[in-house]
């Protein structure tokens, strides 16, 4: 499929579902906003799914894609043999790690190569969440274009992508330039120590839940952030609201959630 056809399929996420999911978090028996970015991640995920009821939000099957250039073929081979730290970290959330060696010779070919790989693996593996890492020469344009194509395809198929490091953020920036609604499908895994990492996330309007002082964007941060993605969903599904717990109305009136609602109504 040509990249323009993919772009035509990308639509903004359902902000009404996002707000209703956040409303559920606000109604849980806990301090308002106390789960911070866990709430934001899950509410944004609900918007992607177009669902907001707890029984409809499930843990997505996931993979972590590590993108490589020809100069890093040895690292790609080690990843596929399970001899790289990211493989062990990803296993904690049952995430499979795939290494992709970008072979495209120009930008258009790279965009379509990335899009094709993403489509193939979403269909083959039933993926609902994909993390990105990158092992390539700094700012390799063809690798960045391949990742951008993959992000576009994921957004067209309503699958969120979690970013790791400068190269993946540059890919997201490129994808957003082609289709602004793509940003709705992008999540930040962590802030790496790479130069410009924090500024790129700010430019994209994304906030990362982790700052692990990891010096690169090879995927380790995303592998750890996958556990937080699960934690947000678990809280959303398993914690109870005042109503679900059968808390008396007179007690509910003193909850922080209700007090904030009263303040907003003034």
Feature-to-residue mapping (PLM):
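N-terminal loops that bind phosphate or other acidic moieties
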Residues: 1-266
